[in-house]
Amino acid sequence: MNALPLGTVPPQKSLIAIPAWNEAGSIASVVASVQEHRPDADILVVNDGSTDLTAQEAQKAGARVVSLPFNVGVGGAMRTAFLYAQREGYQALVQVDADGQHDPADLDRLLEGLADSDIVVGTRFHPESMYFVGGPRRWAMVLLSKALSWMNKGTISDPTSGFRSAGPKAIELFAIEYPADYLGDTVGSLSIAIRQGLVIHEAPVTMYFRQVGRPSKNALWSALYLGRATLAILATGLKANRTPREDAS
C-alpha cells in the first residue's frame, strides 16, 4: 500500500472519499464535479487495485490518491479512507461513487445532516426521485429496509446507498471496524453502526445510472445476497432485543 499523504486539517474540514476500481473513464469528471460543488473539501480517491489509468486520471483532476496493491473491494477501500480521515483529523467524510451515479450537488445536504446525526444516508427513494429499481432486487431491498429500520428505530429506506456522510463518531468506529465483504460498505456498516448506538438519519438525494462500465454483480445475485443479509440482520436484532428471562429459557 502506498504511504498515506500527511497534512494539517482544520476542525470540521470534510473529506470526500471516492473508492475506484477501473473507473478511468469517469473518475476525472466525478472529481471535477465534486470540486465545483465543494471547493473547500479535500478529495481522496482510493485506487482499488485498478489495472487501467484510474490513479493517473484522478491525480490529473486534482485529487489525492492512495493506491492499493490489489483489488480488495469497496469495503476495504473505504476502510482505508476512514483510516486516513481518522489519522488526519477530519470531522466529516462523504463517500461518493466513482462511476457518476451520485450527484455532488447533494453534498451540502449530507454534510449539514451531520449536525444531529452520526451518519446520513442519501436515499434515492423519495417522492421527487425518478430512480427505479424493479424485480427481485427491489423486493429484497424493501425487506432489508424494514429490517434495518426496525433495528434503527428510524427509517432507512435505501440501505444499499453508498452515497452517505459520516461524522466523528462514525469515522472513529469505521477506522477500526468496517466490513470488507460485498455490500459491507453499505448494509454491513449500517448494522455495525446501529449496534454501537450511532444516530442514523437519511436525506433525499439524486442518483443516476452508471456513466460507463457495468456493475460487479448481476441483479439476481444481488437480490439473493440482500435476502440473506436481511435474515442475518433480523437474527442479530432479535438476539439483541431478547430479555434476560428469554435468554435464560
Summary of predicted features, one role per range:
Residues 1-33:
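N-proximal low-complexity "stem/linker" segments adjacent to membrane-targeting elements
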Residues 2-6, 12-13, 169, 228-249:
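Terminal low-complexity segments of carbohydrate-biosynthetic enzymes
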Residues 23-26, 50, 103:
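Donor nucleotide-sugar binding loop of glycosyltransferases
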Residues 32-41:
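Short, acidic, metal-binding catalytic loop of nucleotide-sugar glycosyltransferases
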Residues 47-55, 100:
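A conserved acidic beta->alpha catalytic loop
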Residues 68-87, 104-183, 209-227, 242-249:
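Acceptor/aglycone-binding surface of glycosyltransferases and processive sugar-polymer synthases
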Residues 90-101:
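Short beta-strand-to-loop acidic/aromatic patch adjacent to the donor-nucleotide binding site
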Residues 155, 178-181, 190-208:
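Catalytic donor-sugar/metal-binding loop of nucleotide-sugar-dependent glycosyltransferases
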